[in-house]
Amino acid sequence: MYAIIKNGGKQYKVKEDEVVKLEKFDLGIGEKVEFDTVLMGQTAAGEVKIGAPTVAGAKVVGEVVEQGRHKKVKIMKFRRRKHSMKQQGHRQYFTAVKVSSISL
């Protein structure tokens, strides 16, 4: 059983009892979160439901387990023949959610 949800302009494939790192949102650790924008899902019986654009009445419930930052991504701009370069780093914030139930 799985579902494809939309969060923060991105799509994520989630399964029950799986921890997923999503875009950061302001909730404390241990709080419940509910996603209503389920784009597609598969039931335990194997039936696939596709939304247009979302599956009606479907929702994914999870619990926040961690707030953190990803590893650093280095951005480097190099100007050829000028002996000049610029280096910059970025660490994106995330919220880790453990999916507790999927209902389609």
UniProtKB/Swiss-Prot annotation:
MF term (GO), any: structural constituent of ribosome
CC annotations in GO: cytoplasm; ribonucleoprotein complex; ribosome
Gene Ontology annotations of biological process type: translation
Tagged with keyword Protein biosynthesis: no
Protein name: Large ribosomal subunit protein bL21
Subunit: Part of the 50S ribosomal subunit. Contacts protein L20.
Record family assignment: Belongs to the bacterial ribosomal protein bL21 family.
Gene transcribed to yield this protein: rplU
Record keywords, A-Z: Ribonucleoprotein, Ribosomal protein, RNA-binding, rRNA-binding
Source organism of the structure: Francisella tularensis subsp. tularensis (strain SCHU S4 / Schu 4)
PROSITE patterns xref list: RIBOSOMAL_L21
